[in-house]
Amino acid sequence: MDISSGLETHCPRERRSVPRARRFADETLTGWGLAGWGRTGDVLLCVSELVTNAVVHGVPPGRQLLVFLRWDGRLLRVEIHDSGGGEPRATDGDTCAEGGRGLLLVTLLSDKWGVRQRELGKAVWCDFAL
């Protein structure tokens, strides 16, 4: 598959979008023959964390987010597009806080992650080498 192609789904700004996006990613990986891949759990957790961040911090009310997966046989990229402003930053994660560890987990589980500004909002992405 060409890295420029991929599969996507739109999700509303709702907490129930997190399991929906995770299922989409799981079904996509299965369709690409990656169901038994040793990093599938890492990918699914990163999808959950990035979608949660988009729902809580990135998507203005009444808008949707986009989950986009690309795979070229060597590299899997997860992208979460939202129309919110700002740039997310990984923190050390306060051990007493209820949240704040999502990007720390993405940092630890993926090979690389970053933010790409778009005309309207941003795309937060993470890569996994196969």
Which sequence ranges carry the predicted segments?
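Alpha-helical protein-protein interaction elements
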Residues: 16, 37, 49, 105, ...
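Histidine-centered phosphotransfer motif of kinases
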Residues: 42-60
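Conserved short strand/loop->alpha-helix "switch" segment adjacent to the catalytic nucleotide/phosphoryl-transfer site
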Residues: 26-48
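Conserved beta-strand-loop-beta-strand hairpin that lines the nucleotide-binding pocket
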Residues: 1-10, 55-130
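Short, structured helix-loop boundary elements
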Residues: 15-18, 40, 44, 103
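Preference for short coil/turn "hinge" residues that link or interrupt alpha-helices
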Residues: 11, 27, 52-53
